[in-house]
């Protein structure tokens, strides 16, 4: 948090090891978003290096979406996109998020 000058809240389920970092940012300021992205990248990389995952029982979240390939590889994310298209051929379910837009929703 200090290194990136952001506030991070961490909630979770200690009994099963699920931690949910939440980075406080002001979307009106690109610098705030940039710092949040950098902090989340560091958190995601460390979680994966320690044998963890980017997401447990909750969704992936817009800040972690750009790091899906780190965990699942290009082939895994490509499969996710194909499944999304199969179940949502018209792109009406959560349009532009995660498999279609990544960080765009954070900046908008």
Locate predicted features:
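Conserved glycine-rich FAD pyrophosphate-binding loop
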Residues: 1-108
